[in-house]
């Protein structure tokens, strides 16, 4: 009976001599260790998966990886992880000396202090400002983005109803009507769309009741004589050049966005989405496969010659296009390489007098896309991932190519109504979505650890 008592007393003496290891026969520091630093847990934070880590270890992991996932099992956590109060109090009571030493080391490490501050700021942005506002935030349906989607849904319904009601008028456009069947009013409409200068001759054409058949027979000499009396040689040349295009096509060539969409629904949808997601590849495609009809007017609009900067309107300037000069190519290539979305914004700016609101939507969207692209480059630079740029470029090229081929294969099967919905969504709704993306990037930049 005496020997067991002695062994028990010896065990208690050993525990008093080594208080950092255990306070009982079966509890040691190793059982409360963090799987990141392999030291005792300080402010233990338990994730949704059940794993616990030191809060500063979790903050360092988040700052370096920018991922909201468990460092051990890689399961994503939901919400913002909090300190396990029960586990923290138990560890502090069992191992007070060890916790005190760890706290002193942590407070002396500036990197850890900054990471904890950034991590907490990130958490404050994720949770409601006050407990009483939790239910109100849920009723708001997710905040700003939910409100945006609600507004977009209402606007989408209005636009789709408008498109449905005006569907017949789209087929009555002059781009679908043979020239020989034009009335005198339609001839005047065609003339006025050449530019503001053409309104000078409106009454002369109306008084003579020039219809489509008569228009096809007019020559340059007749335009210069009574009753038309077009004395300005550049005006006569512009009218004759456009008349030659009308004779060659048999219909009026498209001169604005809606006429272009009516004649080329597939190409307009392709250009809208391609220039939005991959402007550099899209412009390269236009240069290789659609040089005369699309690329040449585009480069002359965004990089005009100095002698072209006269009072002529945009339609008149695009009637007779020559090969770009080296100066135009230099200006284009610089913008193409560094600011591709600026090219789209400049093109839309030149069409403001024709498409007042639509051009403004395009300009705003181009600016937002430029900012988002800048954020992408900043992330690559800050994470030292420049070596991955070639791989990213190849992946992007492969993704865009496969998507384009997929759409081209199934294009005949896609209803026109669906194409119109996609077109209006990308044209008017995408800028509002990009505003929300820019706001999120700015918030993320605030919490980024430098």
From Swiss-Prot:
Residues 1-20 are annotated as: Disordered. Residues 182-249 form the SAM domain. The chain crosses the membrane at residues 141-161, 332-352, 361-381, 405-425. It catalyses: S-ubiquitinyl-[E2 ubiquitin-conjugating enzyme]-L-cysteine + [acceptor protein]-L-lysine = [E2 ubiquitin-conjugating enzyme]-L-cysteine + N(6)-ubiquitinyl-[acceptor protein]-L-lysine. GO terms for cellular component: endoplasmic reticulum; endoplasmic reticulum membrane; membrane; plasma membrane. A zinc finger (RING-type) spans 34-74. SUPFAM superfamilies: RING/U-box (SSF57850), SAM/Pointed domain (SSF47769). It comes from the Eukaryota. Gene3D superfamilies: Transcription Factor, Ets-1, Zinc/RING finger domain, C3HC4 (zinc finger). Residues 162-331, 382-404 are lumenal. One of its GO terms (biological process) is protein polyubiquitination. Glycans are attached at residue 232. GO terms for molecular function: caspase binding; protein-macromolecule adaptor activity; ubiquitin protein ligase activity; zinc ion binding. It is a multi-pass membrane protein. Mediates RING-dependent self-ubiquitination leading to proteasomal degradation. Keywords: Apoptosis, Endoplasmic reticulum, Glycoprotein, Membrane, Metal-binding, Transferase, Transmembrane, Transmembrane helix, Ubl conjugation, Zinc, Zinc-finger. Its EC number is 2.3.2.27. InterPro entries: SAM, SAM/pointed_sf, Znf_RING, Znf_RING/FYVE/PHD, Znf_RING_CS. Its main location: endoplasmic reticulum. Expressed highly in brain, moderately in small intestine, weakly in testes and only faintly in liver and skeletal muscle. Not expressed in heart, kidney, lung and spleen. It is found in: Endoplasmic reticulum membrane. Membrane-bound E3 ubiquitin ligase that plays a role in several processes including apoptosis regulation or reticulum endoplasmic stress. Has anti-apoptotic activity, both for apoptosis triggered via death-receptors and via mitochondrial factors. Contributes to the dynamic control of IRE1/ERN1 signaling during ER stress by inducing BAX inhibitor 1/TMBIM6 proteasomal degradation. Promotes the activation of TGF-beta signaling by mediating the 'Lys-63'-linked ubiquitination of TGFBR1 which is critical to activate the pathway. Interacts with CASP8, BCL2 and BCL2L1 through SAM domain and also with HIP1, IFT57, ESRRBL1 and BCAP31. Interacts with NGFR; this interaction inhibits NF-kappa-B and JNK-related signaling pathways. This is Bifunctional apoptosis regulator. It comes from Homo sapiens.
């Amino acid at each position: 009976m005496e020997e067991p008592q002695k062994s028990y007393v010896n065990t208690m003496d050993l525990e008093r001599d080594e208080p950092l290891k255990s306070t009982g026969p079966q509890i040691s520091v190793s059982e409360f260790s963090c799987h990141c630093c392999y030291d005792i847990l300080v402010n233990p934070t338990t994730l949704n998966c059940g794993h616990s880590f030191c809060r500063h270890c979790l903050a360092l992991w988040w700052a370096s990886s920018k991922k909201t996932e468990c460092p051990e099992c890689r399961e994503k956590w939901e919400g913002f992880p909090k300190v396990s109060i029960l586990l923290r109090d138990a560890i502090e009571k069992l191992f007070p000396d060890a916790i005190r030493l760890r706290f002193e080391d942590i407070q002396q490490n500036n990197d850890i202090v900054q990471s904890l501050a950034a991590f907490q700021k990130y958490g404050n942005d994720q949770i409601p400002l006050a407990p009483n506002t939790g239910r109100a935030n849920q009723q708001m349906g997710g905040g700003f983005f939910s409100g945006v989607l609600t507004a977009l849904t209402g606007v989408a319904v209005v636009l789709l109803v408008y498109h449905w009601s005006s569907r017949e008028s789209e087929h009555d456009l002059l781009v679908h009507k043979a020239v020989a069947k034009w009335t005198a009013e339609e001839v005047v409409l065609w003339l006025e769309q050449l530019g503001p200068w053409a309104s000078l001759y409106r009454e002369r054409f109306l008084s003579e009741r020039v219809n489509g058949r008569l228009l096809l027979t007019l020559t340059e000499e007749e335009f210069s004589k009574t009753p038309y009396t077009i004395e300005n040689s550049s005006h006569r040349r512009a009218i004759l050049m456009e008349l030659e295009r009308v004779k060659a096509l048999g219909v009026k060539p498209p001169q604005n966005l809606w006429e272009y969409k009516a004649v080329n629904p597939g190409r307009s949808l392709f250009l809208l989405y391609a220039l939005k997601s991959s402007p550099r590849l899209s412009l390269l495609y236009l240069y290789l496969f659609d040089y005369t009809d699309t690329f040449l007017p585009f480069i002359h609009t965004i990089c005009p010659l100095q002698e072209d900067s006269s009072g002529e309107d945009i339609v008149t300037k695009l009637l007779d296009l020559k090969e770009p000069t080296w100066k135009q190519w230099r200006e284009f290539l610089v913008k193409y390489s560094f600011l591709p979305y600026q090219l789209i914004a400049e093109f839309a700016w030149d069409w403001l007098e024709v498409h007042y609101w639509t051009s403004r939507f395009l300009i705003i969207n181009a600016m937002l896309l430029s900012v988002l692209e800048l954020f992408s480059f900043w992330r690559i630079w800050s994470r030292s991932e420049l070596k991955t740029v070639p791989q990213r470029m190849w992946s992007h090229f492969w993704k865009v190519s496969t998507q384009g081929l997929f759409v081209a294969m199934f294009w005949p099967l896609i209803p026109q109504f669906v194409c119109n919905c996609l077109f209006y969504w990308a044209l008017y709704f995408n800028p509002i979505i990009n505003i929300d993306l820019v706001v999120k990037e700015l918030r993320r930049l605030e919490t980024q650890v430098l």
